[in-house]
Every structure is written in structure tokens, then in C-alpha cells.
Amino acid sequence: MAELVLKQGETVIATARKPEVLDDLKAKYPPSQLLTVKLDVDNSQDIKDAFAKAKETFGRIDVVFNNAGWAVAGEIEGHPEKEARRMFDTNFWGAANVSKEAVQFFRDENKPSGGLLLNNSALNGVQAQSGLGYYAASKYGMFIFVMTDVAKLTEDPSHSIRRFNSSSCRGVGSSLEY
């Protein structure tokens, strides 16, 4: 997604738990167009720091594409609870906390134009398949989070949210590892 936006000539703040995985992208685009920032969505301070660094560097954020997530396949009875909880921490709570920070940023920093918040859930969140029960539950939780009370933010102009949505895409391969 970041490279697609960069190819259109737009400015991007690309985040990853291990920013060095973005070095190839960083080599292709100038610092005036691309900022890479360490962001582990399981760490609330990382979230705050990433938004602060974006403001310091570019002054505003117009779009947040919330895409963190990971999955481990396996039968429910064989899945270690600790691993399932860690997956929920990232897939639901991490995405929810980034959403919360984005809403606050759009309201406080981008007056009056606000911003666009897109949360990438997963097709498995609405059309689950065997072996991905915990993953599907975490992604469905994010989908419902967006579609319920949080979606009402777009109805209240004081929140400065132009759009808040959730996409449910198929899985994609990634070189970014958990």
C-alpha cells in the first residue's frame, strides 16, 4: 500500500515493528516523501511516538491505513491461550489503539479538514475458515468495532473524521515478520 501511494507522488509515513525491513523502500524515495518509523501496535507509547514524529516531520496526517495483524493456523483445542491472546492484542487492541490515536489527531491537529481512517480487517473476519478461529474472532472484533459506535464519529463534525471504514481483504504475503 505504501509503495502504491508513493508512486502517485504522495507523502507516506511507513511504520513497522522493525523499520529496517523498510530499507529497500527508503532507498527508492527521498526523505521529503517517505518517513519510516518504528511502530509496534502492541506498545501504546510507540503509537503516540509515531503520530508525534509524523506531526513533527510533515505537520499533518491526512490518511491512516491501519493494517497490523498476524495469524497462526491450528485447531482451537490445540492453540495455546497465550498465543491467541497475543494475536488479539495485535489484531484487535493494537488496531483499536491506532484508531483512537488517529481520531484524536484528526480532531486536534487537522482542524477543520480532519482525516480518513481505513482499518484493514480480513476476509476471515467475516467469512471464517477452519483452523483460523482465533484469528477470525480477532479480525471480526475489529470489523464490528469499526461498524458500531466508532463509525458514528463520521456523523459528528466535531470529530473531523471524513470517513472511517473497514475493508475485509484476502490474506497477502509479506516479508514483515512478527
Please provide the spans of the model-predicted regions.
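A glycine-rich helix->loop->beta "capping" turn
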Residues: K53-N66, V72
